[in-house]
A protein has these predicted regions:
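Phosphate/oxyanion-binding active-site loops and adjacent basic polyanion-contact surfaces
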Residues: 148-152, 208-220
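Second-shell loop/turn segments in exported
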Residues: 16, 142, 146, 202-206
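Short acidic-hydrophobic, aromatic-tinged amphipathic segments that line or gate anion-handling sites
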Residues: 66-75
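Acidic, polar low-complexity linker/tail segments
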Residues: 81-136, 143-148
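Von Willebrand factor
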Residues: 8-12, 130-189
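VWA/integrin I-like adhesion module and closely mimicked acidic/polar interface patches used
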Residues: 2-6, 13-62, 70, 240
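Short beta-strand-loop
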Residues: 47-57, 171-203, 222-223, 228-232
Length: 244
């Protein structure tokens, strides 16, 4: 089985969206396009709004990804865990799909004999190590996120360091919502490292509403733009299709 490119959206927020399209619907659209949507809800003072929590879970479920509610001080390890878990889940889904084609509709990794299952798990681990990864990060910069942004910045830098220890190539892009003039603003174009976030984040002025749906919509457009450009240049890539 050949390695392909894993595509993820990582949404970091602390509450409920209050403008624009339904974010869960946009996450479902992302899943249809082979993009996994992971959501991390950042808590403060032991609480997170109940409607916000429901929305976080709904977005991740619709996007075939992982959701996690976390205190800001545990954000760094959570960002890494969620990203890696989603990678493994996507690859397992693809492997299960291939097993069904080879062995029949009811076959899956869990139903294989222990020795064969061990071999498949090794394949999944290897693919997680060598597959290319594209992560588009959406950071909520509404007013309530003001004191959490320094932690978000450090967590994303730690994420790029951790993932760059893999063999496979990584590309990250960072968008914020709301932006200065629009609902969404690109902060950082595709790059293998996120070190430059230190300077960029220090200039951010959090405030305003939480247009999560429009932010996800813009993320999809950005992925499609990248894919179209590669196709036009004759360098189209293989992408993992969501098979979960």
């Amino acid at each position: 089985m050949q390695s392909s490119t894993l595509r993820q959206i990582l949404l970091i927020t602390d509450g409920c969206s209050n403008k624009g399209t339904d974010p869960a619907a946009m996450a479902a659209l992302a899943r249809e396009q082979g993009i996994t949507v992971n959501v991390i809800g950042v808590m403060e003072n032991d609480t997170i709004d109940e409607s916000g929590m429901r929305e976080i879970e709904a977005i991740a479920a619709a996007g075939g990804g992982v959701s996690q509610i976390v205190y800001s001080q545990a954000l760094s390890q959570t960002v890494q865990m969620v990203t890696r878990k989603a990678m493994t889940t996507t690859i397992q889904g693809v492997v299960n799909k291939e097993l069904k084609q080879i062995l029949g509709r009811n076959s899956s990794i869990e139903e294989l004999p222990p020795d064969k299952r061990g071999e498949i798990v090794e394949v999944v681990d290897e693919l997680s190590e060598i597959s290319e990864l594209e992560v588009l990060v959406l950071v909520d910069t509404s007013a309530s996120m003001k004191h959490k942004l320094p932690t978000v910045k450090e967590s994303l830098i730690d994420l790029s360091i951790s993932l760059n220890a893999r063999i496979g190539n990584n590309r990250f892009s960072v968008f914020i919502f709301p932006g200065k003039k629009n609902d969404v603003e690109k902060l950082l174009d595709w790059t293998p490292k996120l070190d430059s976030l230190s300077k960029i984040f220090s200039k951010l002025t959090p405030g305003g509403i939480t247009p999560t749906g429009p932010a996800l919509s813009e993320a999809l457009r950005y992925f499609e733009k990248k894919r179209s450009l590669r196709s036009m240049l004759g360098n189209d890539e293989q992408y993992y299709e969501d098979s979960i």
